[in-house]
A protein has these predicted regions:
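Thiamine diphosphate
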Residues: 2-169, 174
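Conserved thiamine diphosphate
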Residues: 161-203
Length: 211
């Protein structure tokens, strides 16, 4: 979407909004989402820019038309979901909230996905371990949730250095794991993850082992 198109769309919808605490011209949640095919996206002009991994994730999420984003802050994931919060406020995510803790996060995002909305969450290291109980059912149910995991050592005592221990856990859950090595991957993988997970999702229609 061009800046001119975005501005025009904002001007056409903001007059209907009256939300206390929001500045004049605030765009409703999700109002700037636009459906575009993969072929059309590939034809758009491209440029090379320098950005952090969290900023790359933000640009990927902006293009993903996310319906629900739920997370609980944990270093170093907090900045990424903060960026998602900005996208919600700008109108690129329909609904966003911070859960009470990690098990609550994974339970809530599972419910959202099972209800049929495009769902995004993120966590890191110890947070993933705390939420593991709730996400264990995702692969068997084939829920198309996209979870961004920022690799961090599983700490005792406290440590925040990078590590791949939680990836080892995820590889044995049955979940599809896309491992990003740079900012370009962190832009590409979330978009690919949504397309792949929704393509292979067979919610409630999987044949039983006897079929």
């Amino acid at each position: 979407m061009s800046p001119e198109t975005a501005e025009a769309k904002q001007n056409s919808t903001s007059k209907h909004v009256n939300v206390p605490g929001k500045p004049e011209g605030w765009v409703p949640a999700g109002d700037l989402q636009e459906v575009i095919s993969l072929e059309e996206m590939q034809k758009l002009p491209k440029e090379t820019i320098f950005m952090t991994g969290s900023e790359a994730a933000r640009e990927s999420i902006r293009r993903a038309n996310v319906d629900m984003a739920i997370a609980y802050p944990i270093t170093p994931q907090s900045e990424t979901m903060q960026q998602a919060g900005y996208l919600f406020d700008e109108g690129y995510i329909k609904d966003y909230y911070r859960a009470e803790e990690e098990i609550g996060t994974m339970s809530a995002i599972s419910g959202a996905s099972r209800a049929g909305v495009r769902s995004l969450t993120a966590t890191s290291g110890p947070g993933l371990m705390r939420g593991m109980e709730a996400l264990a059912s995702w692969p068997g149910a084939r829920v198309p949730i996209v979870m961004l995991n920022m690799c961090r050592v599983i700490n005792t005592p406290l440590a925040i250095q990078p590590d791949n221990a939680e990836i080892s856990f995820l590889l044995n859950t049955g979940m599809l794991v896309l491992h990003a090595e740079n900012q370009q991957d962190f832009f590409d993988w979330p978009l690919i993850a949504f397309m792949v997970s929704e393509e292979v999702c067979l919610l409630y229609t999987s044949p039983s082992p006897r079929d």
